[in-house]
Amino acid sequence: MSQGDTVPLHPSSQSDIDEIENLINESVQSGPGTVLAARPPSPTRPSIPVSSSSSSSPFMQSNLPPLHPSSSAQKVTHVPVPPPLPAVSNSSNFQGASAFGSPPNTLTEPVWDTVKRDLSRIVSNLKLVVFPNPYREDPGKALRDWDLWGPFFFIVFLGLTLSWSASVKKSEVFAVAFALLAAGAVILTLNVLLLGGHIIFFQSLSLLGYCLFPLDVGAVICMLKDNVILKMVVVSVTLAWSSWAAYPFMSSAVNPRRKALALYPVFLMYVSVGFLIIAIN
């Protein structure tokens, strides 16, 4: 491109170029020893005051108590120790056997402790059945802890008393008395169950055996006093006593409309035992 083809610059651009050239020429003429003036320092900025005291703090105060790192880091919870259990005696073991729960272990106890426990149970059941008490109308409470040792003892004792009272054939008298009482108790229990009675089989045997206690007392008195009139009076009293002891338990076990069917055989068996006491001489 030739010089004739150049495009002229805008007046403002030409003035800027001229100003730049003038500044360059002035810097060259002034020489290298000239130092330009330094930029003035900027004004200091205001600083935020920081105080260590809590009263001049710009933040809002909290009502929460300060945390202690030592107590929060090592927090120990104290668990209360339960009191020791009281000592259990032998008498409490016997009471626990008749309540709900597992019975106490009696395999390692002395023989004398077992005998004492059985004797105390026999005496307790005898009081509940024969003698007046508030539980006579409730057979479930009266014979809850039933046993067969007491009835077995009263049956054997009555048979021995009758055999001692007999002058001849003592062994036959004992066999007849024992068979009559044992078979009679089983038959009477089956009779109550067939009538729809709500009673346990062995509980009924225990009840009928304990009700023989008055007849045992009457047999001992008749053995000591050989008098027919005295025998009749004693047997009548003891027969009524035994029937009175068995009445509430047997009557409450069956339907009220079948009460006579359950009580009549019981009364008949006790009457048979009474005739044996009077007849044996």
Swiss-Prot record:
Annotated region (Disordered), positions in chain: 1-88
Ranges annotated as biased composition (Low complexity): 47-65
Compositional bias annotation for Polar residues: 1-15
Gene Ontology CC: Golgi apparatus; trans-Golgi network; trans-Golgi network membrane
All ranges on the Cytoplasmic side of the membrane: 1-147, 250-259
Tissues and organs where the protein is expressed, per its UniProt entry: Expressed in developing root hair cells.
GO MF annotations, alphabetized: protein homodimerization activity
Effect of deleting the gene: No visible phenotype. The double mutant yip4a yip4b exhibits disturbed trans-Golgi network (TGN)-Golgi association and cell elongation defects leading to reduced roots and hypocotyls growth associated with an abnormal cell wall composition and a mislocalization of trans-Golgi network (TGN)-localized proteins SYP61 and VHA-a1. The double mutant yip4a yip4b also has a reduced number of root trichoblasts displaying Rho-of-plant (ROPs e.g. ARAC4/ROP2, ARAC5/ROP4 and ARAC3/ROP6) patches and leading to an almost complete absence of root hairs. Strongly reduced ROP2 plasma membrane localization.
Protein name: Protein YIP4a
Function: Together with YIP4B, involved in the regulation of cell elongation during root and hypocotyl growth. YIP4A and YIP4B are central trafficking components in Rho-of-plant (ROPs, e.g. ARAC4/ROP2, ARAC5/ROP4 and ARAC3/ROP6) small GTPases-dependent root hair formation, thus contributing to activation and plasma membrane accumulation of ROPs during hair initiation. The ECH/YIP4 complex is involved in the modulation of the trans-Golgi network (TGN)-mediated trafficking of some proteins and cell wall components (e.g.
GO biological process terms on file: endoplasmic reticulum to Golgi vesicle-mediated transport; pectin biosynthetic process; plant organ development; plant-type cell wall cellulose biosynthetic process; polysaccharide transport; protein transport; regulation of protein transport; root development
Membrane topology: Multi-pass membrane protein
